[in-house]
Structure formats: C-alpha cells, structure tokens
Amino acid sequence: MIENTLKIEHHKLIILGSGPAGYTAAIYSARANLEPLLFTGNNKGGQLINTNEIENWPGDSKSLTGLELMERMHNHAKSLNTKIIPNEIIRVNFFKIPFLLVSDTNQYYTSDSVIIATGASPKYLGLTSESKFIGKGVSVCAVCDGFFYKNEDVAVVGGGNTALEEALYLSNIARKVYLIHRRKTFSAEKILISRMLNKTKKNIILRTGCIVNKIIGGVNGVRGVQITCNDSKENKCLINLSGVFIAIGHAPNTKLFKNQLFMKNDYILVKSGIHGNVTQTNIPGIFAAGDVIDHVYKQAITSSASGCMAALDAEKYIDQKYGFKI
C-alpha cells in the first residue's frame, strides 16, 4: 500500500539506464513527445565509459573514447528535454497499471510504459582470494586504475575484446602485461588480436590454456597470481606482479525484475521476430534493450539500435492504449 501522503510522479515513459540503449531510447521517445524520464542508475554512462578507444562507431573514422561518446548522447537527450535523474530505481511493480517504480530516495513514480536498459556489470573470477583484494590490486577497469601500475608488472585475465583492449592499454603503462586466458585461442576481433600479438614482441606475455587458482597478497595489496596451465611441466606456477585486471565478461543487471519478467540465464526475454514490437517483454508496456537482452553481439551500436526499437515500440504502445496524440 502507498500512503496517501506520498507524492507520486506520473510519466508517460520511464527509461532505466544511461548507456547507449537508454540514451538512444530517450532521444527517440523525446522526439515523439513522450517526455521521457531517464534514471541513470549508479553507473552513469554505462560500461562504455571505461572504453579507452572506439574505432567502429559509424561516422567517426578517428577513434573516440567511450566517455566522449556517452557525453554526446547525454547532451543530445538533454537537448530534447529528456528529464535525467541521477538516481537508481530499487523497487518495481509491473503487475499493476500504471506501473510503479520506487527510487533510492524513496520517491514513488508511476508510468504508462517502461524501457529497461540497465546494462551489465563485470564478472569476477569468484575466488575467495580475489574478493579480499578488490580495490587493492584487483580491478575490472584498466582505464580507471591502470595509472597506478606505471612500470610495474600486471596481469589481464580473459580472451575477448575487453581483455585485449585492457592488455593493449596497460602495455603502454606497465612494465610487463601477462595475458592469462583459459583457452588457446582468443574470441576477440581479429584486428585486436593482431595488435596484441604485435605487442608480444615488446611487453605482452601470453599465458594461454591457463586458469587463475589464487591471487596472492598481503596488507599492502596484490603480490602475485598462482596459475595452472595445461601444457606446463610444473602445472602450477606463480607470477609475481602488482595488479590483476579481470575481463571475463559481464552479467546483465536484471535482478530487480526477477519474478516479474521472463528471463533466461538472467537475460530478459523479448518478443523478437519480424512483426514489430520486438523489444516487448512478457508484460505489455514493459520493453527492454541493450545488454539486458543481448548475450551475443554486445556492441555499442547494437545496444543503441535496440534502444531505438524500444522507443518506437513504446510510442506505438502508448498511442494505441492511451490515444495520446503523438
């Protein structure tokens, strides 16, 4: 029950998330006169702000940083009078219309439609020794923390785009960069693999077919990692270093919506298909876009595209259900 004394704000459309999907949804829905309200969440700009170089954004032949791109999107959405709130939604009820959302400031909101674009968060290895050193030598962001390891030895764990981007970035700061990957081959883009292999002539050292068993350190932080390699005669070996950067993928931020929306492996299920309304969830009026629905492509541009589709789907839903003149 909501007490009558509480002030409840009502909006046609509320967008959760401030990555490429969220901001693109805001731009399109604002142009449709839906007057969207966007909650940035705690991770303003999404995980893209930690990307040092984006070389595949159409129209930008010269690379730009993730922060630059997200600032552009933020400013674009704001210029169209999107109301942007730097808070997080901590509770939702999608079973009643209008939909109810509660922020971390205990402000209540209702909405005719919601677009979920809450993105994903970095995964950790799950080691007991890892959790002790988060912020003390264990990091998930080379752009954020790489500076602290100038002329020191570090490791990057992973084999995808993020891992190779982190390794390449750190190779310009650290003395040595150990790239530890559980497989023998990398899943990153070919151009990144080529650049990384070229850097093996300098200061990137490959440890493929290896897993991290333990992160070793003391009161002053990380001192090394213990790894097990398939082709190692000793099987286990210790690498002395000062920092470990984890880049093994991301998990969608969808916990808030469990028991209300249909999911598979924590990814929100949407209609897809060829008949439109592709971003709708199992609840009409609730749409999802970006990394919360995509475990395959995981690109800024595909997130942005799905944000566009979600806005168009929401516009059609609101127009048909409520008859707004858009």
UniProtKB/Swiss-Prot annotation:
Disulfide bonds join C141-C144. FAD binds at residues 40-47, 291-300. GO terms for cellular component: cytoplasm. Its EC number is 1.8.1.9. GO terms for molecular function: thioredoxin-disulfide reductase (NADPH) activity. It is found in: Cytoplasm. One of its GO terms (biological process) is removal of superoxide radicals. Belongs to the class-II pyridine nucleotide-disulfide oxidoreductase family. This is Thioredoxin reductase. It comes from Buchnera aphidicola subsp. Baizongia pistaciae (strain Bp). The lineage of its organism: Bacteria, Pseudomonadati, Pseudomonadota, Gammaproteobacteria, Enterobacterales.
